[in-house]
Amino acid sequence: MHIMEGFLPPLWCLIYYIICIPFIVYGIMQIRKVTAESDEAMPMLALSGAFMFILSSLKMPSVTGSCSHPCGNGFGAVFFGPAVVGVLSVIVLVFQAVILAHGGITTLGANVLSMGIIGPLCGYAVWLGLRKLNVNDEIAMFFTAFVADLMTYVVTAIELSLAFPKPDFFTALVTFLGIFAVTQIPLAIAEGILTMVIYRFIKQQKPDILVKLRVISKEEAGVN
């Protein structure tokens, strides 16, 4: 999903930077809030960021000027909300652009918008919806990660189609989505399973963390 350096026209790069700014500012405020409220927040923030960095570094080349890979953005969204993931994604994407030549600085706004804002936001909406329907938290985590991953690529396809609407936007969008779908649907399923397994491990070993971060209730965690 990382759009490479210099691939987008400068105007679109600027637009995406501007769109991201208020989300990142709000995310920083949320990080200050959650770290002040709970001592467990900082290590979980680090884990969420590391999870995103590792998964999104496992890239497969794509002919779209982007690439395919897991995203790891649904995991942090469940623990801290999508705004915090936006801030984590900035850190992850800057490191990947500078150290791994994965993505770019000019395209940072576009990549943050897809992987750090809209993808996690959609995944978090799925989490809230499924939990209101009393769906098991582990199953809900699977679908959260699955949707966050896929929506990241839907947004990337939209960004590419807006920049290169040939012969028109909708035709370009169908083309980009079709190319991404071949690799991304299996990757999203695999990411959903991996995220669910890691979540289950945390729930079994440190259920109190999930309670303190208001992810699940004491009854679900089995703690007093």
UniProtKB/Swiss-Prot annotation:
* Family designation: Belongs to the CbiM family.
Organism for this UniProt entry: Methanosphaera stadtmanae (strain ATCC 43021 / DSM 3091 / JCM 11832 / MCB-3)
Its predominant location is membrane
What protein name is recorded for this chain?
A: Putative cobalt transport protein CbiM
Q: How does it sit in the bilayer?
A: Multi-pass membrane protein
Q: Which InterPro entries match?
A: CbiM (IPR018024), CbiM/NikMN (IPR002751)
Q: Which gene encodes it?
A: cbiM
Q: What does this protein do?
A: Part of the energy-coupling factor (ECF) transporter complex CbiMNOQ involved in cobalt import.
An example Gene Ontology CC term for this record = ATP-binding cassette (ABC) transporter complex
Q: Tell me where on the tree of life, at the top rank, the source sits.
A: Archaea
UniProt keyword Repeat, yes or no: no
